[in-house]
Amino acid sequence: MNQLDALREMTVVVADTGDIEAIRQYQPQDATTNPSLILSASALSQYAPLIDDAIRYAKSKSGNKAQQLVDAEDKLAVNIGLEILKIVPGRISTEVDARFSYDTEKTIAKARKLIGLYNEAGVANNRILIKIAATWQGIRAAEILEKEGINCNLTLLFSQAQARACAEAGVYLISPFVGRILDWYKANEKKEYAAAEDPGVISVTAIYNYYKQYNYKTIVMGASFRNVGEITEIAGCDRLTIAPPLLKALAESNETLVRKLDYQGEILDRPAPLSEAEFYWQHNQDPMAVDKLAEGIRKFAIDQEKLEEMLSAKL
């Protein structure tokens, strides 16, 4: 049995891509997209009809150019999601504009709009996850959305404080990042790490065990991998979202895969939820998490703006 098939027996495998052909090839349960993946997918020729449809939709909705641009980017993200949902049996994650990461109300409004576009296309809420950056404001937005039956995927998660606050808010799923944590430590500590000592692996392992220890139902979906070793070291995690090159590497490897995450300890009483002040104090004790959350939001916002430039030229 290859490692990808072995992994599927202990973990739900998700494709981290907007590339429909790659998704078709590796047959994941779910798929995740983000502004950067939507931007790169939009450059593929087979996506031209989806872009054209988004432009037509936007023009039919408003005569205002600025509003057309907003409507076109939302519709394009949903169009790509709809194509992916024809292939995956589970859920698609579609991301809220990263520029709303510190605005609870705008995040909620955008999430409702994206869900509405999916619903208009005949897709029920139980096939969609709304991706939101795991800022305090984003977590509060997710708490409200979850109560409305809109499940959320809290992303750009780098600290234990972020993970704890998400669980306490009743968030459906979190995406703790592995590879970007490794990137920070390699750049700042100037050293290499074996897979078992990888700071990203250690972080996700701690989050997974914390959730199981306190019986939180929030799903842990490891994300952002730099190598196969990071994946195999957290085999057994609830879900893992993996880019096509690493799905390929797993499918081509027949090395034995051992389950690494499998909490068997006692279940403890949950602590009182973090206050906003406690959240910021704990999150800001971790310079890596502070750097990578801010950088991740900036990068997604830059790619959102590049996508807008591409769409604006067509409006």
Curated annotation (Swiss-Prot):
EC top class named in words: transferase
Source organism, top-level taxon: Bacteria
UniProt keyword annotations, A-Z: Cytoplasm, Pentose shunt, Schiff base, Transferase
SUPFAM superfamilies attached to this UniProt entry: Aldolase
Compartments where located: Cytoplasm
EC number: 2.2.1.2
Alphabetical GO biological process terms: carbohydrate metabolic process; pentose-phosphate shunt
Molecular function per GO: transaldolase activity
Main location, first listed in the record: cytoplasm
Family matches, as CDD domains: Transaldolase_TalAB (cd00957)
Pathway(s) where this gene product acts: Carbohydrate degradation; pentose phosphate pathway; D-glyceraldehyde 3-phosphate and beta-D-fructose 6-phosphate from D-ribose 5-phosphate and D-xylulose 5-phosphate (non-oxidative stage): step 2/3
Reactions performed catalytically: D-sedoheptulose 7-phosphate + D-glyceraldehyde 3-phosphate = D-erythrose 4-phosphate + beta-D-fructose 6-phosphate
Disulfide bonds: none
InterPro entries documented for this protein: Aldolase_TIM, TAL/FSA, Transaldolase_1, Transaldolase_AS
Active site: 131 (schiff-base intermediate with substrate)
Record's keyword annotation contains Magnesium: no
Recorded family membership: Belongs to the transaldolase family. Type 1 subfamily.
NCBIfam families tied to this protein: PRK12346.1, talAB
Function according to Swiss-Prot or TrEMBL: Transaldolase is important for the balance of metabolites in the pentose-phosphate pathway.
Name the UniProt record assigns to this protein: Transaldolase
